């Protein structure tokens, strides 16, 4: 989230799209209801299903799954054509006025630079025009034909209300009603907040879904505002912490990047990741990348990391390609993986194409499962009839189960969707032989290091040089790790005037103190300030709220630097006056920035040319994304890989995303509409949490049996009655479930045909105390978003018949 949960109450309009907050985030959803009940906010829901969220909405608009970009691009066009934008915000705080290269183009579904053989773009034309000083050219009158504003207007001109209705199946009147309410928040004293979740991310165009929404927020002037922003509702407790700490194959903690095999030395790596400002007088905060990286290496390797050895740069692995789950299981399926350590995951139930996952795991020599519960992954080799029809005697994979603790059995911090790090304390000891994950990993690490020390072997140095200075080396305490994340001064730190800022050995209170000379250590720079010499800031429990905005700065700690709303400089105009006095976050008092949040902008007074989006090279919000996304610098509608239309109404020659990575063996397992004519989409229920809570008796009583939802029209055409058992199949497999016939799903008229949706809750499997069921991801395709490789769980093709 750019904002936070409590801030939702400040919105005038709450849009839930790409999620079902009332069902999947019932506690957090109270703040949407607070906005509705106490701030007279309008609640809008755009969803393929009439959900529990929709049941309390003021406006509900149905949409075909996988067409969000068309809907949102239609909103962009409406705002532009009706001049419903915050013009001053757009002019001064976005890149609307910057000029784009003359060779950038878009035609028939493709941007300039496309290589059909490689299925990727040469993105060199997706850039600004630059002057002799290396700065982007600008036309503040917004009249130049190559300025971002005019290129955007041209690009979205196709997304008329009629086109939205034709592609999305959303009735034109419903769409225009949504546009009209959103447009009302172009006024400086009104804001919209967008709440989204996996309903946007789990598509082959997931990142572009989110980006299109962010562009709407920029046009409306809602970024940086209380009651505004881009707000992801994270799907797991502490999944925010997972991404913060870089648990992805090409990431390092704090959103740093793991070096690639093309970055053979430290200088080439730092040059590639340290941007230069593209407009004068910009903060360009990523210019501090070397400080963050060197401090990370000092935390990793301690005294072994020195300037003479490039701070241990050679000890980091260098990636040749992203090893996401789709890639990794494809390698596994092809016999290229020997072992798999599975920590806190249930791939058999959670990853796409369950039958391929089981087949892949069957080709391993060994697998280690670290989990508090018995998962389908840990017992994938057992036969459970139709739902997991395997031959155990043919599977030679040796499975090691290491029982771990759950959150209630350990101390530590949890990072929520709003970037708040909240410390929690152990409620009880773990049962049996269960150990926390840190203790388990420490045990593996020490045994590996001892083997390398005594026997040698390839890649020994990174393990042998690693710093491991915990009081109990076999059991690092959460407090020690948290302080390590925060960071220490390794020498006395002085400012340029000779003033002492921190003594050697002290915990740091700001990442502004991090250095690239080896005098500081921090294993996650964005967490610096979370545990200072004043104590554990994450344990703060003062919920005083003098502003009434919900920015309880004394409750827990938010990264960065306890700031609750990112880019809050944009909440004030260029003169430092808040756009809306009653929603004031920061303002200029004549000498400095002050207010109801931690200012993210301490460097320049009003009247300077310094933009509010301090992490960007140009200091501006990007309506034109440059080369940052795989599909293009503007969002474009591409059909899901399995489309019920068989074409793309906008450009039939380019139906789906042209840059999707698709393995041959997965391509042949994609279905066509002649055999699988209905759209399948997966989702969650309030009564369960993924595949965990089928181990809990109360949850299993509340929702005991697997079911799917279909419309009354589809039920009638297939002869299915409410309560009948049905078989739902895709090109990859089938499941059996009870049919729930409901008006919550509509038959949509799309491009001259009727489109039906089959709703598939995902919680069942063959483990736990709940009634045994089929794994929903038996049906889903093994293809993902081209940027994140998040699988396309939300739009695929199925058939349904009475069982």
Residue ranges and their predicted role:
Residues 5, 397-429, 741, 762:
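Glycine/threonine-rich phosphate-binding loop and adjacent beta-strand/alpha-helix elements that clamp
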Residues 369-375, 380-382, 390-392, 429-445, ...:
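Phosphate/diphosphate-binding loops
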Residues 439-497, 589, 596-606, 613-619, ...:
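Long, contiguous, secondary-structure-rich segments that constitute the structural scaffold
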Residues 51-188, 279-280, 284, 441:
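Long, well-ordered, tryptophan-enriched scaffold segments
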Residues 92-96, 181-182, 197-199, 229-240, ...:
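A glycine-rich phosphate-binding loop feature that marks nucleotide/adenosyl-phosphate handling sites
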Residues 55-63, 378-380, 387, 403, ...:
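Short beta-alpha connecting loops at secondary-structure transitions
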Residues 1-34, 41-44, 70, 148, ...:
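Extended redox/cofactor-interaction regions of prokaryotic respiratory oxidoreductases
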Residues 163-170, 196-204, 235-237, 344-349:
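Conserved short loop/turn motifs at secondary-structure junctions
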């Amino acid at each position: 989230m750019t904002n936070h949960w409590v801030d939702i109450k400040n919105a005038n309009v709450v849009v839930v799209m790409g999620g079902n907050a009332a069902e999947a985030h019932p506690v957090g959803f109270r703040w949407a209801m607070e906005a509705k009940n106490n701030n007279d906010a309008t609640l809008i829901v755009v969803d393929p299903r009439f959900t529990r969220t929709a049941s309390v909405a003021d406006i509900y608009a149905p949409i075909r799954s996988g067409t969000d970009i068309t809907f949102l691009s239609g909103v962009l066009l409406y705002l532009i054509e009706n001049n419903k934008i915050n013009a001053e915000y757009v002019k001064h705080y976005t890149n609307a006025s910057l000029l784009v290269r003359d060779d950038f183009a878009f035609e028939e579904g493709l941007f300039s630079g496309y290589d059909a053989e490689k299925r990727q773009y040469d993105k060199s034309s997706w850039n600004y025009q630059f002057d002799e000083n290396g700065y982007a050219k600008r036309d503040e009158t917004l009249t130049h034909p190559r300025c971002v504003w005019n290129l955007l207007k041209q690009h979205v001109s196709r997304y008329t209300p009629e086109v939205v209705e034709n592609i999305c199946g959303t009735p034109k009147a419903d769409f225009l009603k949504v546009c009209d309410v959103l447009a009302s928040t172009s006024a400086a004293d009104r804001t919209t907040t967008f709440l989204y979740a996996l309903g946007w991310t789990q598509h082959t165009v997931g990142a572009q879904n989110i980006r299109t929404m962010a562009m709407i927020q920029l046009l409306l002037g809602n970024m940086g505002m209380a009651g505004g922003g881009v707000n992801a509702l994270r799907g797991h407790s502490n999944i925010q912490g997972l991404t913060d700490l870089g648990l992805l194959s090409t990431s390092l903690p704090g959103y740093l990047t793991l070096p690639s095999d093309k970055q053979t030395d430290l200088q080439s790596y730092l040059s590639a990741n340290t941007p230069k400002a593209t407009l004068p007088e910009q903060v360009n905060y990523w210019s501090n990348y070397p400080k963050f990286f060197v401090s990370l290496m000092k935390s990793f390797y301690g005294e072994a990391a020195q300037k003479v050895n490039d701070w241990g740069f050679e000890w980091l692995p260098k990636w040749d390609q992203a090893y996401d789950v789709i890639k990794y299981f494809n390698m596994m399926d092809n016999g290229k993986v020997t072992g798999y350590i599975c920590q806190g995951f249930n791939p058999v139930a959670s990853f796409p194409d369950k039958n391929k996952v089981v087949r892949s795991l069957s080709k391993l020599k060994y697998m280690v499962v670290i989990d508090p519960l018995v998962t389908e992954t840990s017992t994938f080799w057992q036969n459970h009839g139709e739902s997991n029809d395997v031959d155990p005697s043919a599977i030679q994979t040796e499975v090691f189960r290491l029982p771990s603790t759950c959150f209630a059995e350990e101390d530590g911090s949890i990072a929520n969707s709003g970037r708040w790090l909240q410390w929690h304390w152990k409620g009880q000891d773990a049962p049996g032989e269960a150990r926390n994950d840190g203790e388990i990993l420490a045990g593996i690490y020490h045994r590996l290091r001892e083997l390398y020390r005594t026997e040698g072997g390839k890649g020994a140095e990174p393990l042998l040089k690693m710093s491991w200075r915990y009081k109990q080396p076999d059991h690092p305490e959460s407090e020690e790790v948290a302080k390590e994340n925060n960071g220490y001064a390794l020498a006395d730190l002085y400012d340029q005037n000779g003033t002492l800022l921190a003594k050697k050995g002290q915990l740091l209170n700001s990442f502004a103190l991090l250095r690239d000379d080896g005098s500081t250590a921090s294993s996650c720079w964005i967490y610096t300030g979370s545990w200072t010499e004043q104590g554990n800031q994450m344990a703060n429990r003062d919920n005083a709220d003098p502003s009434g905005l919900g920015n309880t700065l004394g409750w827990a700690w938010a990264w960065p630097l306890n700031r609750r709303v990112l880019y809050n400089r944009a909440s004030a105009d260029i003169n430092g006056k808040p756009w809306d006095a009653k929603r004031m976050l920061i303002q200029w008092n004549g000498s400095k920035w002050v207010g109801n949040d931690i200012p993210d902008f301490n460097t320049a007074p009003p009247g300077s040319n310094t933009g509010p989006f301090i992490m960007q090279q140009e200091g501006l919000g990007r309506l034109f994304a440059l080369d940052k996304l795989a599909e293009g610098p503007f969002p474009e509608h591409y059909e899901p890989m399995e489309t019920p239309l068989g074409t793309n109404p906008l450009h039939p020659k380019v139906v789906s995303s042209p840059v999707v990575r698709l393995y041959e063996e997965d391509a042949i397992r994609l279905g066509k509409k002649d055999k699988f004519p209905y759209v399948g989409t997966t989702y969650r229920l309030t009564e369960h949490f993924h595949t965990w809570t089928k181990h809990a008796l109360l949850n299993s009583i509340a929702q005991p049996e697997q079911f799917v939802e279909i419309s009354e029209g589809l039920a009638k055409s297939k002869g299915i009655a409410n309560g009948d058992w049905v078989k739902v199949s895709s090109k990859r497999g089938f499941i059996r479930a009870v049919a729930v016939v409901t008006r919550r799903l509509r038959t949509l008229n799309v491009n001259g045909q009727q489109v039906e949706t089959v709703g598939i809750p995902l919680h069942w499997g063959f483990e736990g105390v709940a009634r045994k069921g089929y794994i929903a991801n038996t049906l889903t395709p093994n293809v993902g978003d081209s940027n994140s490789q998040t699988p396309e769980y939300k739009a695929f093709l199925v058939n349904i018949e009475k069982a």
